[in-house]
C-alpha cells in the first residue's frame, strides 16, 4: 500500500494479507487468530487508512502463515467484506472474499441467559442461523435471540 510519500508497510514474501477489514477491527482479527506478537512472525497492522469501498479500513499482514477455513469463517463474522490475499514470492497468488457461513456453530455464546445452550445440564453447542448479511444479524436456533455484528465482534474480541 502506498501513500503520497511512499510505502506505509513493506510487502511480505510469503503469507497472508487480510484487507478491507472495517476500521477498528484489526485487533479483533488478531485476537481471533490467536496472534499476540510474541510468536516471532512478522505482523503488520494498518488501521484507519482510506478506502474507496469502506471510507476507512484496517489491513493485517501476516508473514509465513496461511489461514484455516475455520479462521476465515470467524473473520467473516467481524469483517464480512474482507478479502484474503495469499502471498507467494511477494506476489498475490490467490485472492478470495470471505463469506459468512449460513450456520454458525460453536463459535459464539447465545446472550440469552435462559437459552438451553447456557444451561450447564445440557451439552448443546450454540448454533445460529444468518438472518442478514449486511448488516450481519444472527439468530439463535434454540431460543430465537438476535445477535448483531457489534455483539459478535465484542464476543470474539473477548475470546468468546
From Swiss-Prot:
The keyword Metal-binding applies. Its cofactor is Zn(2+). Binds 1 zinc ion per subunit. This is Aspartate carbamoyltransferase regulatory chain. Keywords: Metal-binding, Pyrimidine biosynthesis, Zinc. PANTHER family: ASPARTATE CARBAMOYLTRANSFERASE REGULATORY CHAIN. Transmembrane segments: none annotated. One of its GO terms (molecular function) is metal ion binding. It comes from Hyperthermus butylicus (strain DSM 5456 / JCM 9403 / PLM1-5). Contains catalytic and regulatory chains.
Amino acid at each position: 500500500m502506498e501513500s503520497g510519500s511512499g510505502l506505509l508497510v513493506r510487502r511480505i514474501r510469503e503469507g497472508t494479507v487480510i484487507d478491507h477489514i472495517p476500521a477498528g477491527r484489526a485487533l479483533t482479527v488478531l485476537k481471533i487468530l490467536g496472534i499476540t506478537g510474541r510468536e516471532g512472525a512478522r505482523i503488520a497492522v494498518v488501521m484507519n487508512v482510506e478506502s474507496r469501498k469502506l471510507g476507512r479500513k484496517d489491513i493485517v499482514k501476516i508473514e509465513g502463515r496461511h489461514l484455516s477455513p475455520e479462521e476465515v469463517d470467524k473473520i467473516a463474522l467481524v469483517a464480512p467484506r474482507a478479502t484474503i490475499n495469499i502471498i507467494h514470492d511477494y506476489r498475490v497468488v490467490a485472492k478470495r472474499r470471505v463469506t459468512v457461513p449460513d450456520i454458525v456453530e460453536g463459535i459464539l455464546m447465545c446472550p440469552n441467559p435462559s437459552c438451553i445452550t447456557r444451561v450447564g445440564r445440557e451439552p448443546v453447542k450454540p448454533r445460529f442461523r444468518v438472518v442478514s448479511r449486511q448488516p450481519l444479524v444472527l439468530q439463535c436456533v434454540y431460543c430465537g435471540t438476535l445477535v448483531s455484528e457489534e455483539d459478535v465482534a465484542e464476543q470474539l474480541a473477548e475470546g468468546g
